[in-house]
């Protein structure tokens, strides 16, 4: 959790009382109205070919389930990859977004380009820690998973949660090695990216104090490198790394800002733009996206164009959120760059943390999580409520 539970609820009370006329619910039925994975109506965005519920939290509305063994009511933190000719999918399940050991990761495989998924592995949290934020990467023909483990502590800005990034690997996606620490105490690894045989991740310090680049040559042993962004007053955290065609490294730094700005409903919405050139020994951060705070971002290229899926903040709506598709334009090798909002996926409440896998040069499978769409709760209330994992196929050739 990014804030104390009591603080969250206190902040939520004025938000839910706000006029939310500007954030009408999206036109998808509540996922408990049918089987998980059933097709649902979606907003009329031309690039979204289909969308459906893949993991149904509404079917597990029981506060006393053993989430280390079964799917529970709050499902989140997705990722996708392709491995051995199949699409692989991972997500977290728990009772809520609150930190705790009653949580697990579920790993699935699809051999029909994401139409259906079969569970291949269940990876419960350590007995005294929470687990979350999984991401796939591959080393020497094996599938690897990075995740974050934290103590079950309620604190502001993830302070004193003693984050430890852990890793595990598998030759087949079914049989996994034991979880082992791959990062130092107090640092959260975001997504892992590979470039010329070297693995990179941006790590943010507990308390959301700074972001530092880490590198590895084997995906297991990681070494701290240069700072990416160190202005702790901006509350920097999840930082998505993207290698550009010309070799520049882009870091998009989520900045939650001041106490009043943490929930994204008032004040500034900003994402810091940081750059590094080979051999990536220093970063400069000359610009920022003003008006867009990209929470939990995932970037991907499609036919030379750079896209991002991230949480979108709808200010003035009582704290409502969406998962949105953006495109980054401009000079992609060092800037300046700009951001274009292409529209929203079916989403509401606690939402985003998407995964992306290419199906063909213009079609991509996307996963994300969302609260009940017709209910359209605020983000804060959604953190404690039911969430489903959605999947959709997007056609980026429709974006002209």
Give the positions of each predicted feature.
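Bacterial N-terminal signal peptides that target proteins for export
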Residues: 1-7
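Short, charged beta->alpha transition segments
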Residues: 6, 131-134
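C-terminal motif of bacterial Sec signal peptides marking the signal peptidase cleavage site
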Residues: 14-17
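Beta-rich carbohydrate-recognition and catalytic domains
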Residues: 21-25, 29-73, 81-129, 137-295, ...
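Hydrophobic, well-ordered secondary-structure elements that form the walls
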Residues: 356
């Amino acid at each position: 959790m990014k804030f104390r539970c009591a603080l969250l609820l206190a902040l939520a009370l004025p938000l839910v009382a706000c006029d939310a006329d500007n954030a009408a619910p999206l036109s998808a039925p509540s996922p408990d109205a049918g089987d998980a994975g059933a097709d649902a109506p979606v907003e009329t965005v031309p690039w979204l070919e289909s969308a459906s519920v893949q993991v149904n939290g509404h079917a597990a509305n029981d506060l006393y389930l053993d989430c280390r063994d079964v799917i529970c009511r709050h499902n989140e933190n997705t990722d996708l990859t392709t491995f051995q000719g199949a699409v692989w999918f991972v997500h977290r399940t728990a009772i809520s977004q609150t930190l705790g050991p009653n949580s697990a990761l579920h790993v699935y495989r699809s051999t029909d380009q994401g139409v259906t998924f079969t569970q291949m592995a269940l990876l419960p949290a350590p007995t005294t820690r929470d687990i979350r934020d999984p991401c796939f990467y591959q080393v020497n023909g094996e599938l690897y998973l990075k995740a974050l483990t934290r103590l079950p502590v309620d604190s502001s800005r993830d302070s004193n949660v003693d984050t430890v990034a852990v890793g595990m690997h598998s030759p087949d996606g079914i049989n996994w090695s034991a979880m082992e620490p791959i990062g130092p105490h107090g640092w959260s690894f975001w997504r892992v990216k590979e470039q010329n045989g070297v693995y990179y991740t941006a790590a943010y310090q507990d308390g959301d104090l700074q972001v530092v680049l880490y590198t590895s040559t084997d995906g297991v042993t990681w070494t701290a490198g240069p700072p990416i962004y160190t202005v702790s007053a901006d509350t920097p955290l999840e930082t998505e790394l993207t290698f550009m065609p010309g070799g520049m490294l882009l870091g998009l730094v989520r900045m939650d800002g001041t106490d009043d700005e943490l929930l994204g409903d008032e004040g500034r919405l900003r994402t810091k733009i940081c750059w590094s050139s080979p051999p990536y020994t220093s970063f400069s951060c000359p610009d920022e996206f003003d008006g867009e705070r990209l929470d939990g971002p995932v970037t991907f290229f499609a036919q030379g164009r750079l896209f991002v899926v991230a949480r979108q903040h709808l200010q003035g709506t009582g704290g409502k959120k969406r998962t949105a598709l953006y495109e980054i334009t401009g000079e992609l090798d060092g800037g300046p760059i700009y951001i274009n909002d292409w529209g929203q996926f079916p989403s509401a409440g606690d939402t985003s943390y998407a995964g992306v896998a290419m199906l063909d040069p213009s079609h991509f499978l996307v996963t994300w999580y969302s609260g009940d769409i017709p209910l359209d709760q605020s983000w804060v209330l959604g953190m404690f409520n039911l969430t489903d994992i959605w999947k959709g196929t997007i056609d980026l050739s429709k974006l002209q």
